[in-house]
C-alpha cells in the first residue's frame, strides 16, 4: 500500500483528493494536515460525508510526515507550497504539488505573473511537469511533480498532436475556455452563487490569466520554438466542468478524418484520452466526475482553420484526478487505479 498524506483539505481539490484516495485499492491515507495548529480537528467535523474515515487533521509536521507517508499531495494556495516543498523533499518524501509554484521552469516568469518572489528556486529544476500522458517516463523517476493547471490540461492535450505533427501554424493560436465556478476556488464559488448566479462572463481578458505562460511554455517544448497564444477564460454557472475551444490556422489543407487518425495514433494506449469521431458534439456532462479528457475536432474548410474542442472535469483530470494518476505512475501502479 502507498502511504499518502494530504496537506490542505478545506478547498475543492483537497476534498476531491480525499474522495478519490479513500476508494483507491492501493492507498492508505496516513496523514491529513492543515497549514497551522488552528486547523486541528476531526475530518468528520469538516466533511460529515467522510465519516467512514477515522482521521484527524493535524498541524503540518515534516518529521511526522517523513515517518508515515511515502507521498504527499499539496493542495495549498500559490506562494505557499514553495515554503513547504524543500522540507519535504529533503526529508525523502515524494511530493505532488497542485499549486503553480513549480510549473514554470523560469523563476522570473513565475515572479512576474504571480507577483511574488520564489524562495525555492533551486527545487524548480527537480520538478517534473505532471501532464501524465506527455511526461510519463519522467514522472516515473520524479521526486517532485508540478501538477498542471486545469485550463492548461485541456489546451495542451488538445493541441499536442497537432503541434508535434507540424501541420499547423504556431502563430495566432486562439483559445476560448469555459470553466465551472469551482475552478476559481471555494471562496470565489460561494461568492458567485450568492451574488451573481446565474451568470456567464469572461474574465482576465487580453492576456492577463496566469495560466498563459504555462500553456506557452509546454507548447514551446513540444514544438521546439516559441509559441504565443491568445487566451480568454470564462466562468459558467455550473459547479464543475471545463471546455476549451481552440482555433489554429493550418499550413496546408488536410481532411478532418486524417487529423483524427493522427490524434488517435498520438494517444494510442492512453486510457484517459478519448478522440471522438468526426461531427460528434462534445459537452462537459460527458466527462463530469471522471478523469477523462475528450477531444473532438473539425477543419473549417472555408477559413482553413482547425477547430479543436477539449473537455475535462476541472476538479478531476484538471486537478486531483491527474494528481492521483501521477502518483500511480510514480509507484508503478496501473494508471487507472482508483480512477
From Swiss-Prot:
GO terms for molecular function: N-acetyl-gamma-glutamyl-phosphate reductase activity; NAD binding; NADP+ binding. Signal peptide: none annotated. It is found in: Cytoplasm. Its main location: cytoplasm. Pathway: Amino-acid biosynthesis; L-arginine biosynthesis; N(2)-acetyl-L-ornithine from L-glutamate: step 3/4. Its EC number is 1.2.1.38. One of its GO terms (biological process) is L-arginine biosynthetic process. The active site is at 150. Disulfide bonds: none annotated. The keyword NADP applies. The keyword Chaperone does not apply. HAMAP family: ArgC_type1. This is N-acetyl-gamma-glutamyl-phosphate reductase. It comes from Endomicrobium trichonymphae. The gene is argC.
Amino acid at each position: 500500500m502507498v502511504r499518502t498524506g494530504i496537506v490542505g483539505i478545506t478547498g475543492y481539490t483537497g476534498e476531491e483528493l480525499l474522495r478519490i484516495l479513500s476508494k483507491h485499492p492501493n492507498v492508505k491515507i496516513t496523514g491529513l494536515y492543515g497549514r497551522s495548529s488552528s486547523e486541528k480537528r476531526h475530518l468528520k467535523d469538516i466533511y460529515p460525508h467522510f465519516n467512514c474515515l477515522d482521521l484527524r487533521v493535524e498541524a503540518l509536521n515534516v518529521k511526522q510526515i517523513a515517518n508515515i507517508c511515502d507521498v504527499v499531495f499539496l493542495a495549498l494556495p500559490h506562494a505557499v507550497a514553495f515554503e513547504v516543498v524543500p522540507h519535504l523533499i529533503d526529508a525523502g518524501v515524494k511530493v505532488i504539488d497542485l499549486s503553480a509554484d513549480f510549473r514554470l521552469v523560469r523563476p522570473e516568469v513565475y515572479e512576474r505573473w504571480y507577483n511574488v518572489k520564489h524562495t525555492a528556486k533551486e527545487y524548480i529544476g527537480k520538478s517534473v511537469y505532471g501532464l501524465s500522458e506527455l511526461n510519463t517516463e519522467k514522472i516515473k523517476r520524479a521526486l517532485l511533480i508540478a501538477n498542471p493547471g486545469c485550463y492548461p490540461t485541456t489546451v495542451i492535450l488538445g493541441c499536442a498532436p497537432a503541434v508535434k505533427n507540424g501541420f499547423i501554424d504556431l502563430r495566432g493560436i486562439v483559445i476560448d475556455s469555459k470553466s465551472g465556478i469551482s475552478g476559481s476556488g471555494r471562496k470565489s464559488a460561494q461568492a458567485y452563487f450568492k451574488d451573481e448566479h446565474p451568470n456567464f462572463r469572461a474574465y482576465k481578458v487580453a492576456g492577463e490569466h496566469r495560466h498563459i505562460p504555462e500553456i506557452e511554455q509546454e507548447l514551446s517544448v513540444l514544438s521546439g520554438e516559441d509559441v504565443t497564444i491568445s487566451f480568454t477564460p470564462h466562468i459558467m454557472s455550473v459547479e464543475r466542468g471545463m471546455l476549451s475551444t481552440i482555433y489554429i490556422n493550418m499550413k496546408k489543407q488536410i481532411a478532418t478524418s486524417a487529423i483524427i487518425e493522427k490524434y488517435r495514433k498520438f494517444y494510442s494506449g492512453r486510457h484517459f484520452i478519448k478522440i471522438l469521431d468526426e461531427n460528434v458534439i462534445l459537452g462537459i456532462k460527458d466527462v463530469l466526475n471522471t478523469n477523462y479528457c475528450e477531444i473532438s475536432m473539425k477543419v473549417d474548410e472555408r477559413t482553413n482553420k482547425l477547430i479543436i474542442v477539449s473537455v475535462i472535469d476541472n476538479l478531476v483530470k484538471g486537478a486531483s484526478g491527474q494528481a492521483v494518476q501521477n502518483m500511480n505512475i510514480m509507484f508503478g501502479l496501473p494508471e487507472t487505479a482508483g480512477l
